Amino acid sequence: MAEIKVLALDLDGTLTNSQKEVTPRTRAALDAAIAKGVTIVLASGRPTAGVLPLAKELGLDKKGGCILSYNGGKIIDCRTGETLYQKQLEAQYVPELCAFAAAQNVTIITYNKEGVVTEHPDDKWALRECFTCKLPMTGVDDLAKYVDYPICKMLITLDPARRDEVWAAGKKQFDGRIDLYPSSPFFIEAVPLGVAKDGSLAALLEHMGLGRENLMACGDGLNDRSMIAYAGVGVAMQNAEEPVKAVADYVTAADNDHDGVAEAVEKFILK
């Protein structure tokens, strides 16, 4: 097996436990991996600002590392803040996505420099995004008119019972123009066509002069499936959705509440 030089980690349901914390064992495993020269990439659907606090908590702003945000829409260098990769959602799709969400009677959000923006600031799933990312909420009257600046993604929030139904309708309406896929039972991501974690990681590896055989990726959600299939070592958490486990090279015995990431890092990097 080729030496692992890059470790891509999904956050929610993978790196963090149910309390959105990184446990001491997992933190120690990551510190040991960094000491061996491994570059940590925090790979999330969250906006960049929603990943920065965790990156700082792990010391990546000083030790080095990257943030892959918006499900692959942007990658930054944690130490310098430099943008290494970015793809933005074409402005023409913002009003159509807002209209689609209204027709489906679900909430849609996006982000500004400060935090989360939506027409439905009391929506419990939108508030969950604020809590998870530690970002403030801004309520607006007309989201389509408000968004007059470049964005990397929009996010549909909805009751889990409706996720697959709304996802199917969205894929049909936007087929071949933008990509929609679930990142949790209550979130559907709307991103530029072709944006996914695997593609942006491929660009990062090329930038670093490395290949996919040097990448290990850990995740649990459907939006992690592409990077797990792409990586030289693809790891699905015990709590991962079944289609994710199906493409993984390894499924952890432990879930995200019991140091599943530490288990994988110890097995494949610190062995």
Positions of PLM-derived features:
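Asp-based phosphoryl-transfer active-site loop
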Residues: 3-19
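Conserved acidic, metal-coordinating active-site core of Asp-based
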Residues: 100, 104-218, 222-224
